[in-house]
Curated annotation (Swiss-Prot):
CTLH domain location: 164-221
UniProt-listed Pfam families: CTLH
Zinc finger (RING-Gid-type) boundaries: 329-391
UniProt record similarity statement: Belongs to the FYV10 family.
One record GO biological process: negative regulation of gluconeogenesis
The name this protein goes by in its record: Protein fyv10
GO MF terms, alphabetically ordered: ubiquitin protein ligase activity; zinc ion binding
Subcellular location: Cytoplasm; Nucleus
Residue span, LisH domain: 126-158
Entry function: Involved in the proteasome-dependent degradation of fructose-1,6-bisphosphatase.
Biological source species: Aspergillus clavatus (strain ATCC 1007 / CBS 513.65 / DSM 816 / NCTC 3887 / NRRL 1 / QM 1276 / 107)
Length: 406
């Protein structure tokens, strides 16, 4: 009884390992929102304080007319009103993030109030998490409209990152269509964070702009290309010297060249590379997993079920029309077999074997009585013969050998 209670006791901390991004993303968004406020205040302070001091000194020294002083004050008031509007917008964004964080914390706290895996509340909580994982997978796959509709129907809009992934997919799509403007704007907004990134997204985007200028073949624009390289590429000379030297060599090769690496630089596949690079950089900055959370959850379960017989040459039920069994193994299913292919085998501390094991000539082991009963049920096996239920091979009963387990 004690062992049964232990096996069904819920360990909330282990369950929450998969849900770390649930709180990381709002935290990162709140941090970025605060940085935006800080930058706005610093920028306006650097303008207003010197302007106010200058206007006051000019008024005391009678070096400008009252109208000029009023005009200077009006300009400062206008700047401060603009700052107020921006601050109000950022405050609303902060409130939205805080409300989102509150609901996510409440969702995770519910798990700590569930004592057992057998509790009906755990089934309800798990259903919500499954909905979250499915929506996360849909968003990463580009099905943003369907994901949004599902989130609204399930009432979990605050538990999924709709806006984050929608923006990510929009920019990634623009890159696949050959447009760098949105991606560069995103880089400018996250310039400080990108300095710590292990990816060189902004350099690759500027390099692509350089390539597109040269691709025109207009030698008159080569001067523009060199000016672009001097302004945007040379700052990376210490870390990207090889790429910059190749970019310089690109001036001597037409767009239909067959010489590498210039052929690959002109290739349209670079746009797909840039799109994938942006997604990796975006996920890194927001502490998002590079793989869908649904895949991570499935991988853990698949590894617990996988056995050496999975993914063997005999796993497909269609491979042998004489097979008497249909595979219901999730590891071998069409939908999951590729995901499970590189998963490790399950570790079983206990083994369960028949009490009369025998081995067939093909090396497969079965319980003798169970094998004989199954061969009789098939009906197409001659007397004195047995059929391997996995491979469909037929052997003489005399070929069965007893197996002894030490």
């Amino acid at each position: 009884m004690a062992a049964e209670l232990t096996s069904t006791k819920l360990n909330a901390e282990n369950h929450l390992l998969l849900d770390q991004p649930l709180l990381r993303v709002p935290h990162e968004l709140a941090r970025r929102n605060f940085k935006s406020v800080q930058r706005l205040v610093e920028r306006e302070r650097e303008y207003v304080l010197p302007a106010l001091k200058e206007a006051a000194n000019a008024s005391l020294a009678n070096t400008q007319t009252p109208d000029q002083t009023l005009a200077a004050l009006d300009a400062m008031i206008s700047r401060m009103q603009g700052l107020k509007r921006k601050m109000e917008s950022l405050q609303e964004e902060e409130k939205r993030i805080q409300e989102q964080s509150r609901k996510r914390i409440q969702h995770l706290e519910c798990l700590h109030q569930i004592p057992s895996l057998a509790d009906v509340k755990y089934d309800q909580w798990s259903r919500v998490r499954l909905d979250r994982l499915v929506i996360d997978h849909m968003l990463r796959s580009g099905y943003t409209a369907s994901a949004q509709q599902l989130a609204q129907e399930k009432g979990i809009v605050d538990l999924v990152d709709l806006d984050v992934f929608t923006q990510c997919q929009r920019i990634a799509q623009s890159l696949r269509h050959g447009e760098t403007r949105d991606a560069l704007q995103w880089c400018n907004e996250n310039k400080a964070a990108l300095k710590k990134s292990r990816f060189n997204l902004e350099f690759e985007l500027r390099l692509q702009q350089y390539i597109e200028i040269i691709r025109t073949g207009d030698r008159g624009r080569f001067i523009d290309a060199m000016a672009h390289a001097k302004r945007y590429l040379t700052p990376y000379i210490e870390t990207q010297s090889m790429e910059i030297h190749r970019a310089a060599g690109l001036l001597a090769f037409p767009r239909d060249t067959k010489a590498d690496p210039y052929k690959s630089m002109y290739s349209s596949d670079r746009w797909t590379y840039l799109s994938d690079l942006f997604i990796r950089t975006h996920h890194e900055l927001l502490s998002l997993s590079s793989r869908p959370l649904l895949h991570i959850a499935l991988s853990a379960g698949l590894s617990a079920l996988k056995t050496p017989s999975c993914h063997s040459e005999y796993t497909s039920p269609s491979s042998n029309s004489l097979s008497t069994t249909t595979s219901v193994c999730p590891i071998c299913s069409t939908e999951l077999k590729e995901l499970a292919r590189n998963m490790p085998y399950a570790h079983h501390a206990k083994s369960y074997v028949e009490n009369d094991p025998i081995i067939l000539p093909n090396g497969r082991i079965y319980g003798q009585q169970r094998l004989l009963d199954m061969s009789k049920k098939v009906g197409c096996v001659e007397t004195g013969k047995v059929k391997d239920p996995t491979t469909g091979e037929i052997f003489d009963e005399s070929e069965m050998k007893k197996v002894y387990i030490m």
